[in-house]
């Protein structure tokens, strides 16, 4: 996932083997990260198929209702694995393509069995069948969000339809999920930071694995990396226009002393707010802020963004949501991943799907069908917590709406579940970048290839496996 984020330019090159190949969109067939991911998803499929063999045996004390529910959750996990494999390694956007993935439905993945790739249509058929079973038989109201529910299965199928460019069905299912969410125990968090503090316990989480201190946790390497050029540019451009205070001018402190930041809502000395401005301790002159011609200019916000820390560029003027997505509150790295263990290590879960993503799916799907009023209502709901009002959303022109939906989704959801890459590829294929500025477009990937290569080791172990056309000569 780190490599995919590098490829999407939502994260700088990760400190993992071969990540530079992702950033350059020039991935070798022997890339170790690609091989690890490919193998890992088939390990999930193998585990599911093994479980399905044994769960159908006579197990004392197991009711048929519980057996069916467990089968449904297992099949939902298999659907998630196959959908991810197809989107990473198959021509998922072409319904008539022969380049799906190798399917193991009722048998185990072992012994290097030669296996042809199934077509894209055949792969989608298996995914759809598994999800339909999960929608019908998974728990409706799970006590824990680390279990797959019927609502999650339906949300995952909406995502599947977006991959197929089937916007009508994507919108229909996504809006069903939204209408059913509250009764099933899901909801948007009003505080964005709470999502990543509560992790799999957040009401917004449709599915995230159980990871808990002290013995079961997942290292949060995201925090160690930095947002990519595309994410930073989009976040910069989404900072609302200043309407209240103008630019904030910090007087040059000269040699030492405190730096006094005038309150942008009041007079230059901060008297309107009664607090005398915002003070950044200067001590013996150790706080160095370039003064230029006598003052330091920081782009203005609404007067409520301080205190901030020197050196964080213009992070102080971000809305709360995009502050966390972009840089964090005076943090380096991807600040939403800030969960600490008692041993002071960063640890987190893996956020496979949040309810917010369902709103973005529905909003984009409606906009692509020309249903702009519906799209605006959906977008306004999910970005309200970032400080955007219904009036802000209504001011977006129809021709700009698709582009704005993606910008907000990038800031909200990048560096979580690979989806930003697939979103960018869809916009490149189907349109939506037209309203972006030239500076924003300059930060987009080149889209040389939409897919990853089938790993060289897998090709060598399976005589019937065919490489993706873009990588045949590598």
Regions found by a protein language model. Give the residues of each.
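Conserved, well-structured interaction surfaces
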Residues: 14-89, 118, 136-141, 345-350, ...
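Short coil/linker segments at helix-helix boundaries
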Residues: 65, 88-125
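Hydrophobic-face positions in mid-chain alpha helices that act as interaction patches
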Residues: 171-258, 262-269, 274-286, 291-355, ...
């Amino acid at each position: 996932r780190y490599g995919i984020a590098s490829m999407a330019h939502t994260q700088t090159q990760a400190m993992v083997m071969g990540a530079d190949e992702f950033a350059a969109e020039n991935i070798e067939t022997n890339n170790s990260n690609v091989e690890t991911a490919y193998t890992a998803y088939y390990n999930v499929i193998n585990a599911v198929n093994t479980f399905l063999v044994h769960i159908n045996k006579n197990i004392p004390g197991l009711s048929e209702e519980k057996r069916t529910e467990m089968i449904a959750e297992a099949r939902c996990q298999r659907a998630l694995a196959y959908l991810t494999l197809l989107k990473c390694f198959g021509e998922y956007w072409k319904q008539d393509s022969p380049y799906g993935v190798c399917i193991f439905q009722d048998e185990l993945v072992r012994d290097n069995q030669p296996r042809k790739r199934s077509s894209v249509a055949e792969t989608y058929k298996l995914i759809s069948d598994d999800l339909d079973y999960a929608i019908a038989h998974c728990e409706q109201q799970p006590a824990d969000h680390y279990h797959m529910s019927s609502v999650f299965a339906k949300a995952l199928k909406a995502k599947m339809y977006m991959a197929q460019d089937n916007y009508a069905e994507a919108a229909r299912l996504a809006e069903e999920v939204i209408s059913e969410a509250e009764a099933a125990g899901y909801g948007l968090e009003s505080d964005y930071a709470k999502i990543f503090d509560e992790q799999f316990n957040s009401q917004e989480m449709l599915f995230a694995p159980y990871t808990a201190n002290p013995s079961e946790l997942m290292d949060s390497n995201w925090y160690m990396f930095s947002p990519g050029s595309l994410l930073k540019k989009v976040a910069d451009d989404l900072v609302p226009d200043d309407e209240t205070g103008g630019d904030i001018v910090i007087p040059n402190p000269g040699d030492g002393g405190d730096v006094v930041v005038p309150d942008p809502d009041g007079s230059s000395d901060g008297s309107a707010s009664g607090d005398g401005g915002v003070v950044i301790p200067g001590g013996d002159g150790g706080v160095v802020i370039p003064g230029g011609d006598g003052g330091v200019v920081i782009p203005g916000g609404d007067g409520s963004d301080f205190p901030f820390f020197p050196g964080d560029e213009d992070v102080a003027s971000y809305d709360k949501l995009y502050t966390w997505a972009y840089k964090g509150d005076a943090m380096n790295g991807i600040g939403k991943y800030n969960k600490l263990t008692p041993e002071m290590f960063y640890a987190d879960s893996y956020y496979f799907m949040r309810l917010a993503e369902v709103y973005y799916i529905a909003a984009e799907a409606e906009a692509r069908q020309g249903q702009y009023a519906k799209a605006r209502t959906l977008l306004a709901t999910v970005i309200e917590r970032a400080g955007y009002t219904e009036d802000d959303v209504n001011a977006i022109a129809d021709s700009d709406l698709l582009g704005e939906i993606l910008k907000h989704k990038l800031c909200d959801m990048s560096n979580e579940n690979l989806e930003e890459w697939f979103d960018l590829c869809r916009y490149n294929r189907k349109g939506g970048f037209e309203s972006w500025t030239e500076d924003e477009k300059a930060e987009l990937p080149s889209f040389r290839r939409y897919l990853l290569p089938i790993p060289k080791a897998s090709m060598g172990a399976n005589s019937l496996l065919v490489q993706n056309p873009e990588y045949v000569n590598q």
